A protein has these predicted regions:
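Secreted, periplasmic, or luminal enzymes acting at the cell surface/secretory milieu
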Residues: 66-103
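C-terminal, active-site-flanking charged/polar segments
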Residues: 41-42, 62, 151-161
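Noncatalytic accessory or regulatory domains flanking protease catalytic cores in secreted, cell-surface
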Residues: 30-31, 83, 156-168
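Hydrolase catalytic cores
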Residues: 14-81
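Secreted peptidase-domain scaffold signal
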Residues: 89-151, 159
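Loop/turn elements at helix/coil->beta-strand transitions in domains of secreted/extracellular proteins
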Residues: 9-11, 63-66, 127-130
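Catalytic-core segments of hydrolase enzymes
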Residues: 1-23, 72-76, 131-140
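Residues that flank catalytic or metal-binding motifs in active/ligand-binding sites
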Residues: 9, 16, 67, 151-153
Length: 168
């Protein structure tokens, strides 16, 4: 459970880790539980996402920030709405993650301190829920420092009528 010592949200994401069919000693299979079961699942999904991105983008390697952002934004929310210190962004959803890549539903850009970026997206009629995320590598704070974000980046969404929505 989180948060990290410097206040960052941890864990990032979860995966099935209870009663997972796995190998056991004596060349057999059995049910196992714990992060030793969920972590390989996340690693395998990330490997597939990297491969999928490269196939969709002429062999170009994606940034790790993009891949993590796609993974987190496609997760199925658990617990309290939004990210929390028990479930992170939720349970991994590999299908939704690859759909984000296949449909090119992401931006890759940079922003500086006190900067401002604007991106326009068209939301098709009938969409009931829209998940939008800004992701960056937020490095750890200094040891023994008070919890504080190293980079404080905010997002807001404004529709065609000028109505602005803020996260949480």
């Amino acid at each position: 459970r989180g948060p990290a010592a410097d206040g960052r949200i941890k864990p990032d994401i979860g995966a099935k880790g209870t009663n997972v069919n796995s190998t056991v000693p004596t060349n057999s299979y059995g049910l196992k539980t714990g992060t030793s079961m969920s972590c390989p699942g996340i690693a395998g999904i990330m490997g597939q996402l990297y491969q999928g991105y490269k196939e969709l983008n002429s062999g170009v390697n994606p940034s790790s920030a993009l891949m993590k952002g796609v993974l987190l934004n496609s997760a199925d929310d658990l617990g309290n709405p939004g990210p929390d210190f028990k479930h992170g962004w939720g349970e991994v959803n590999a299908y939704q993650a690859i759909k984000i890549l296949e449909n090119n539903q992401y931006f890759n850009s940079t922003i500086s301190q006190a900067g401002n970026n604007t991106h326009s997206i068209t939301v098709p009629l009938g969409i009931i829920q829209l998940n939008v995320m800004v992701y960056w590598h937020d490095i750890e704070g200094s040891v023994n420092a008070a919890p504080a974000l190293v980079n404080d980046i905010d997002i807001n969404l404004t529709n065609a009528n000028g109505l602005t929505a803020y996260p949480w």
